[in-house]
Amino acid sequence: MNGVCNCNVTLVIAAFGVLAYLLGAIPNGFLIAKAKGIDIRKVGSGNIGATNVYRSVSKALGILTFALDSLKGAIPALWFPVQAAHCAQTSLPAWLPLLFGGLAIAGHTWPVYLKFKGGKGVATSAGALIGIAPAATGIGVLCWFVTLVTIRYMSVASIVAAVAVPAAGWWLYRANGLALPLALTALGALIIWRHKGNIQRLMNGSESRFEFKKKKP
């Protein structure tokens, strides 16, 4: 009987893991821009994320993209573990939010719907982490905002946040084990790596600054 129960738990976790990836893989920026007749992959930076939608389509749709991409991380990390436990009719491992949130981020970064060419994972990561590591995420958001307002480079602000969140994680959570700090470190490294093109543009002086108000033609 215990073997059957373990099998059911494994199947439930696997099923919700697949759903987390598929939800994360929904290319909100691509779909929103497509509805306006724009292929977001062929304008601006070519990225499907919120910043490129903000710059290349409209401010409002860029903000909408950010909100939807954040939800792609929050729903698997916060809601899926509860539903998985309900389906399995037993308590499940405490690391499930990390697993489901990580799979959603992987889906956004490597979406099956767009031949595995996705975004940089900043908004989806923020959504996933707000419930998993709220204090560290809050520190990261503060660092991101101050950097963005100060120097107006979205890429630099995202990289600063990608460093700040793991650093805060080691400070705040290491007493409870290394799993969460290590996961935050891996996620931060992924986000920085996904910004390698931005880093090259920063080095050669061609990176665009973020404009809070779109310039009038």
Per-region residue spans from a language model:
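Helix-coil boundary and interhelical linker segments in multi-pass alpha-helical membrane proteins
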Residues: 1-15, 77-99, 130-137, 171-183
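Alpha-helical transmembrane segments in multi-pass membrane proteins
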Residues: 16, 20-25, 29, 33, ...
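Interfacial segments of multi-pass membrane proteins
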Residues: 54-59, 80-84, 121-151, 163-173
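Loop-to-transmembrane alpha-helix initiation sites
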Residues: 138, 154-162, 176-187
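Cytosolic, membrane-interface loops and tails of multi-pass inner-membrane proteins
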Residues: 30-61, 200-217
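Oxyanion-binding and handling regions
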Residues: 171-217
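Mid-bilayer segments of alpha-helical transmembrane spans in multi-pass integral membrane proteins
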Residues: 108-113, 133
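Membrane-helix interface "capping/anchor" motifs
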Residues: 53, 111-117, 146-160
